[in-house]
Amino acid sequence: MPMNVETRETKKVLNHLPSEETVEKTLKRLQTFSGDQSVVVGLSGGVDSSLTAALLCKAGWDVEGLTLWLMKGKGSCCSDGLVDAAGICDQLGIKHHIVDSKEIFQKEIINNVLKGYEEGITPLPCSRCNKSVKFSEMLKWVKENKNIEKIATGHYARIRYSNESFNENDLPSNGIKRHKLLRGKDLNKDQSYFLYDLPQEILGRTIFPLGELTKEITRIEALKHSLKTAKKPESQDLCLAEHYGSMNAFIDKYLPQKKGEVVLKSGQIIGSHNGIQHFTIGQRKGLGIAWEVPLHVVEIDASLNRVIVAPREDSGKSECIVKDINWVSIEAPQEPIKVEVQIRYRSKAVKAKLIPIFDSNKENYCYQCHIHFEEDQFSITPGQAAVFYMGDYVLGGGLISKEY
């Protein structure tokens, strides 16, 4: 029995060693940038942003907290998040600022999401919110408060700045130095997929202190710091779904139901639906159709108010068009390159060939590209992001287009 107890205690100590070493490395890296620098931390009221603020304080930064008020009511983006964020700032002894961003959130996110569903696409509000609301609002606030130099958030991603020296021999380059975005070390929590659209100006002023940590280490460190949010449950849903109860509840509140047809790829009508906004590519459940084989949504035709379905084996595609591209770690390529493409959050990046499509009206810049996958992909969904990787580096990304 004593041996078992000793073994358990030994394992407990050993399990904590990587945590200590990783956090020490993170603190040293933060300290090399600190000096007399100031930073504002985007605080959501969750454990990730709370530990971000705590680590920066410990590393010697002059820290202030900022929370965006995005929606009225309860939830992480609403009053609950504001209260928890204020509590963390009080605990850490730092200033807390609240920015009323409800109007821009309505315009850039809610209106855009609803428009997308009406057009038969599946919007990706998180990446749009990061670029057009969260980081842009924080940058705007920083510029108005000239004593603040940097922005920090609790995202699980990493940045290599243009003045840092790293081995990047495998990255295509034309000699122009860029701030580079990388996956977070914790691949189970990596959020780089949602950050592909951040411009260079924002990346150059942003810090991701949790980029080298795992979620488990974050929890351990939050408990060590006795942070009030250390045991707060993680949000499992989009903020819109959390706020309204579900995405369907959100959609039903704003978009009217409109009866339409469910058809096979041949055009044969096999059922009906109450609104294309309730469907997404790849969906199998909730079709309300009994068929000899399982059917999946393969296309949504907004012009005809139709949902097209097919067996899984008939729904794979080997290519797609990606539009509205933001190039991150490299300049826009001038010729085809081999990449790995991630077409959904948490999905595995797959090998593909990226062929630039040049716009003669925009100085032959590559805002679109043609993606040829090495193997057929299931559920290539218009409106979702296709993010291009080379190893851990985010080369760029854009939105999957309906046009092909």
Curated annotation (Swiss-Prot):
GO molecular function per UniProt: ATP binding; tRNA binding; tRNA-uridine 2-sulfurtransferase activity
Chief location: cytoplasm
Site (Interaction with tRNA) residue list: H155, Q384
Its EC number(s): 2.8.1.13
Alphabetical list of Pfam families matching this protein: tRNA_Me_trans, tRNA_Me_trans_C, tRNA_Me_trans_M
Disulfide bonds: C129-C239
UniProt-annotated location(s): Cytoplasm
InterPro entries recorded: MnmA-like (IPR004506), MnmA-like_C (IPR046885), MnmA-like_central (IPR046884), MnmA-like_central_sf (IPR023382), Rossmann-like_a/b/a_fold (IPR014729)
Name of the protein: tRNA-specific 2-thiouridylase MnmA
Organism in which the protein naturally occurs: Prochlorococcus marinus (strain NATL1A)
